[in-house]
Regions:
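Specific alpha-helical transmembrane segments that line the substrate/conduction pathway
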Residues: 2, 42-73, 113, 197-216
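Transmembrane alpha-helices of multi-pass small-molecule transport proteins
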Residues: 1-35, 63-64, 116-120, 137-155, ...
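Membrane-interface helix termini and inter-helical loops of multi-pass transporters
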Residues: 42-46, 92-103, 154-173, 216, ...
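C-terminal transmembrane-helix exit sites in multi-pass transporters
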Residues: 7-15, 60-82, 98, 209-228
Length: 245
């Protein structure tokens, strides 16, 4: 989050937004900057395998569409409701895989992260009139402060932990901050200026395709039959969501 803040700060013209944007902006910043990052990293810390976490993160799509229906009044038809339920069923199948019994807690944490990601996408629609660089810069700042404070009070020795990070970890953090947060997330939130959530969010379904391929080549993870079936159900259902107009 700090990397995101530093990268976007030089490109932002600081201007206090209208009061009506205060709560949505703070909510967006806390959901995306703290909720998503915190629970996603917790889930990765508890997980033995990465692939189930990649699939679990796809729940952000149905969560976002459900939230957009409730808070924004975006129309969700019967086919979309059906596909949303099917996607949750796919996650349940993965959770019941005997080989992944130890991953249930990690998948649960990932689902919470996906929930916050969906909420963040809805809140971003409320602040779409604000420059996307500014909103993501504020999100990076608030996310950094909240995570730092949480680390100080819950873990302690935060400065010591930072000093002991090796060069490979710093490179991964730079990749996450620049490529994922600055380029990918900022670009996606920019699209909400022109398109509804149920049009943009389903393209997020491309994420597991690349993720599962990388986990195979990097970690050598081969899914079991039940996990493969559940993963296929999730990927196909969220892909079909973006085909419905």
């Amino acid at each position: 989050m700090f990397i995101l803040f530093v990268c976007l700060l030089p490109f932002c013209k600081f201007k206090i937004p209208d009061k009506k944007y205060f709560l949505p902006l703070i909510g967006f910043s806390l959901s995306m900057g703290f909720g998503v990052i915190f629970f996603l990293n917790l889930s990765l810390g508890k997980a033995t395998f990465v692939a189930p976490i990649i699939i679990g993160a796809q729940l952000a799509i149905p969560f976002a569409i459900l939230a957009s229906s409730i808070f924004l009044g975006e129309k969700v038809n019967i086919k979309q409701w059906s596909l949303i339920l099917i996607s949750f069923f796919g996650i349940f199948l993965i959770g019941y895989d005997p080989n992944l019994k130890g991953e249930i807690y990690a998948i649960f944490l990932c689902s919470i992260s996906a929930f916050f990601y969906g909420i963040a996408n809805v809140l971003s629609r409320y602040i779409k009139e604000i420059d996307v660089k500014f909103t993501n810069m504020i999100m990076g700042f608030i996310g950094f402060i909240t995570i730092l404070l949480f680390s100080i009070f819950s873990e302690g020795n935060t400065v010591s932990h930072l000093m002991n990070i090796n060069i490979n970890t710093w490179l991964l953090l730079l990749h996450n901050g620049i490529v994922v947060s600055v380029i990918a997330h900022t670009s996606m939130f920019y699209l909400y200026k022109f398109y509804s959530i149920n049009k943009v969010m389903p393209f997020y379904s491309l994420f597991p395709i690349f993720g599962l391929i990388l986990t195979f080549f990097i970690f050598g993870e081969i899914p079991t039959l039940l996990s493969a079936i559940g993963s296929t159900i999730v990927i196909i259902s969220v892909y079909r969501l973006q085909k419905i107009r």
